[in-house]
């Protein structure tokens, strides 16, 4: 995994972390929000490991998908809204599963280099 790939894929995790911190600091109306040190630590660790999680999921998925899969299915780009929603769901899944899959991605990255 290159530094460019890491920086490109850490942006989604940083965005979610900044939203969480913003919601903690703007909690003046008395709404209960998950404010704890352990939750903040988990979110920061997930942010750091999110690119590794994405790398591990892509590595595993591309071992099962053939190279010509996207060339043969030209109609995959006909539904841009559905494609965008699926992409956001994929990024959220990578962030939620960042700790276990991130450690796996870190192991795969070290093994391949």
From Swiss-Prot:
A GO term for molecular function: toxic substance binding
UniProt KW Cell wall biogenesis/degradation keyword: no
Keywords on record: Bacteriocin immunity, Plasmid
Highest taxon, organism lineage: Bacteria
The UniProt record lists the keyword Transferase: no
Any one GO biological process: bacteriocin immunity
Pfam family, one: Microcin
Signal peptide as annotated in the record: none
The protein's role, per its UniProt record: This protein is able to protect a cell, which harbors the plasmid ColE1 encoding colicin E1, against colicin E1.
Protein name stated in the entry: Colicin-E1 immunity protein
Name of the encoding gene: imm
